[in-house]
């Protein structure tokens, strides 16, 4: 559930109602008065929630998509990058890591602009360690560790006309906390 709270004398007091009841929250991103939440149950919506009045949060948009993003990152004006999993909704099997670019220019009408599935990649660190993702919208680059048949660090660019493009991949043999850096 999504519950809005307010800090009062060193503790949090619930001020808003429950949203997305019965759903597991996979990722969240707050951009001003709007919060974006991806939940997971059977169908995996991306909610946009108006949080300008903490005592009365309102779902203003909902995009139902297959799979889910367990990492969300703003990617330039009006765009939100999602990294997660592509899931076959009928048999509930994972098809690979899914990249999504969302158009959030109108929070009430969020659209998935483009997707790309890395079919031989089963997981990333993005869902549990936000520092594991390198993302620079100005340079149009983002990267992360990818785990599947091998362990690789992958980097991508995004173009509205052509979608996602892998621009770098390096096998990692001895790894710890590998992160990308642009110099």
Label each region the model flagged:
Residues 1-183:
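Feature marking well-ordered beta-strand scaffolds used for ligand recognition
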């Amino acid at each position: 559930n999504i519950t809005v709270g307010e800090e009062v004398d060193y503790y949090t007091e619930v001020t808003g109602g429950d949203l997305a009841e019965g759903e597991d929250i996979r990722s969240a991103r707050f951009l001003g008065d709007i919060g974006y939440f991806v939940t997971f149950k059977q169908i995996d919506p991306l909610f946009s929630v108006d949080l300008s009045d903490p005592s009365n949060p309102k779902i203003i948009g909902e995009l139902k998509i297959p799979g889910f993003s367990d990492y969300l990152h703003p990617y330039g004006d009006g765009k939100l990058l999602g990294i997660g999993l592509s899931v076959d909704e009928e048999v509930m099997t994972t098809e690979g890591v899914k990249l999504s670019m969302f158009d959030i220019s109108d929070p009430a009408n969020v659209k998935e602009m483009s997707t790309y599935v890395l079919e031989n990649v089963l997981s990333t660190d993005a869902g549990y360690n936000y520092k594991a993702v390198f993302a620079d919208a100005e340079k149009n680059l983002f990267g992360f560790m990818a785990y599947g048949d091998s362990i690789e660090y992958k980097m991508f660019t995004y173009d509205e006309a052509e979608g996602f493009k892998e621009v770098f991949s390096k096998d990692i043999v001895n790894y710890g906390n590998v992160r990308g850096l642009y110099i």
